[in-house]
């Protein structure tokens, strides 16, 4: 199945501790069915001191979310929408179901 959410898309989180937050997809992991969204699902990792990082300490980073837990933000309204594929001018494009707007990318 084709990827409906791609890197650079603006998405809305549908469930979980970050429900309702919006952010840009920084990484798409289609084999795992997950996406990484900027500023969402931030976790803290305790890092030991190493030669590259002699200080060590706490590292905050975004963890992947299941793609089913996010929805693309409609380009017109900013609300969550589903995505469908259509052929326009001989090219396969992604279209927001709610508004019918073509999605970039």
From Swiss-Prot:
Keywords, comma-separated and alphabetical: Ribonucleoprotein, Ribosomal protein, RNA-binding, rRNA-binding
Single GO MF annotation: rRNA binding
PROSITE patterns: RIBOSOMAL_L24 (PS01108)
InterPro entries: KOW, Rib_uL2_dom2, Ribosomal_uL24, Ribosomal_uL24_CS, Ribosomal_uL24_KOW, Translation_prot_SH3-like_sf
Gene3D superfamilies named in the record: 2.30.30.30
Keyword Lyase attributed: no
SMART domains the record matches: KOW (SM00739)
Tagged with keyword Manganese: no
Cellular component, GO, one term: ribosome
Pfam family membership, one: ribosomal_L24
Biological processes, Gene Ontology terms: translation
Biological function: One of two assembly initiator proteins, it binds directly to the 5'-end of the 23S rRNA, where it nucleates assembly of the 50S subunit.
Subunit and interaction comment: Part of the 50S ribosomal subunit.
Similarity comment: Belongs to the universal ribosomal protein uL24 family.
Protein's name in the database: Large ribosomal subunit protein uL24
Species whose genome carries this gene: Sphingopyxis alaskensis (strain DSM 13593 / LMG 18877 / RB2256) (Sphingomonas alaskensis)
């Amino acid at each position: 199945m084709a990827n409906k959410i791609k890197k650079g898309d603006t998405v809305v989180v549908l469930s979980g501790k970050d429900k309702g937050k919006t952010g840009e997809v920084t990484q798409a992991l289609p084999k795992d069915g997950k996406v990484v969204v900027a500023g969402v699902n931030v976790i803290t990792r305790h890092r030991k001191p190493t030669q590259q990082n002699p200080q060590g300490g706490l590292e905050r980073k975004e963890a992947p979310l299941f793609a089913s837990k996010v929805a693309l933000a409609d380009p017109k309204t900013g609300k969550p929408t589903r995505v469908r594929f259509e052929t326009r001018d001989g090219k396969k494009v992604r279209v927001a179901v709610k508004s019918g707007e073509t999605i970039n990318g």
